[in-house]
Amino acid sequence: LRARLRALSVSLAAAIEPAAIDPAPSPARARMEAALATVGGDQPEVVAIYVLVPDDGAGRMHFAADWDRRAGEQVAPGTAYDAAGVPLLMAAVRGPQVEREVVADAWGPTLSGYAPVVDAAGRPVAILGVDIAASTIAAREREAIRRAAALFGVAALLLVAIGAVVGR
């Protein structure tokens, strides 16, 4: 999942034109919003994709764009976000980052990947984030445990059967 978050955030960030960050309607902004919606719609485990613009080095940011699968959770451009408690989000201005643990915020617990949106000179102008819900991660972990238990059970039965045959 972490590799997928990294790949999604990096590829989407690279596709965003710096002009799209401006909240005024423009073709670049329309392309960015369409890209977020298309990728989000095509990736069922993704719950949110957003673009944040750093306002200062202390973690204050604002939303430039937001796509959210959850009804009523989409955030309007210009809405403030305090990233001071999310160090990897703040570090994403220097390069792609993926959370190692689930982080909870006002929208719930998620695992997130971040990548910088850069201008023509390579300067970061925004950060693109991709979130996967913690419930998705928990479901995948439960499935992995179920599969491991099933394999262990099959292996144990085979060992018992082999032991019975060899013991005769």
Annotate the PLM regions.
Residues 66-104:
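Extracytoplasmic/periplasmic sensor domains and loops in membrane signaling proteins
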Residues 1, 140, 144, 163-168:
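Juxtamembrane alpha-helical signal-transduction segment immediately C-terminal to a transmembrane helix
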Residues 151, 155-168:
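Cytosolic-side ends of inner-membrane transmembrane helices, especially those
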Residues 38-62:
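Short N-terminal helix-loop-first-beta-strand/juxtamembrane motif that initiates sensory/input modules
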Residues 97-98, 107-116:
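A short beta-strand signature within small-molecule sensing/ligand-binding domains used
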Residues 113-138:
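Short, hydrophobic beta-strand elements of compact beta-sandwich sensory domains
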Residues 1-25:
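Juxtamembrane extracytoplasmic/periplasmic/luminal helical "stalk" adjacent to the first N-terminal
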Residues 133-152:
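Membrane-interface helix-start motif
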